[in-house]
Amino acid sequence: MKFALLALAAVALASPVTLDERQIAIPENELRTGPCEPITFIFARASTEPGLLGISTGPGVCNGLKLARPFKVACQGVGPAYTADLASNFLPQGTTQVAIDEATDLFKLAASKCPDTQIVAGGYSQGTAVMHGAIRNLPDNVKNLIRGVVLFGDTRNKQDGGRIPNFPTDRTKIYCALGDLVCEGTLVITAAHFTYTVNVPGAVAFLLSKL
């Protein structure tokens, strides 16, 4: 069954996510406010998700990384300039330039504040557009620090040829569920768009394999 895009807010908050996956209390601003860690995870949440990491794939991947590498991971969500509002999905880049700039600044902050860190990143839904827009234009010295990127329900998948432009495909993992039409270049939201928590363990394993 297809849902109108404007129904995304209600459905997103009702999507099936367990309490453990939500990790509501998990830190999400550690790059800005905490010490440097060997691994820095930067994530852009889906439209309507609260906080900086959201309540689904973002905290799930963050928690998975922290469990695998205790006391070695800093998690950072994109925001508050990135508001994850619905209307921004209709813009030419699939999000706002303000959001892209904020993500760009976070990657640059990780590189300048923590030059020895290994960066991994991700995005879900509109957050994938944020990552496409930011990573493609990063200077090489920053881009080279990004070891892996995971994208869930990629709204730029078709437009950008199944990859992040100007970034190695072997460091990118795009998850597009069967029947998720946003991966086909539309903004038609189906139930498949809310199934990506099942891909969190695989995404964590992919990122760890790149470190």
Swiss-Prot record:
Pfam families: Cutinase. The active site is at S125 (nucleophile), D180, H193 (proton donor/acceptor). It catalyses: cutin + H2O = cutin monomers. GO terms for molecular function: cutinase activity. Keywords: Disulfide bond, Hydrolase, Secreted, Serine esterase, Signal. Disulfide bonds join C36-C114, C62-C75, C176-C183. Catalyzes the hydrolysis of complex carboxylic polyesters found in the cell wall of plants. Degrades cutin, a macromolecule that forms the structure of the plant cuticle. This is Probable cutinase 1. It comes from Aspergillus clavatus (strain ATCC 1007 / CBS 513.65 / DSM 816 / NCTC 3887 / NRRL 1 / QM 1276 / 107).
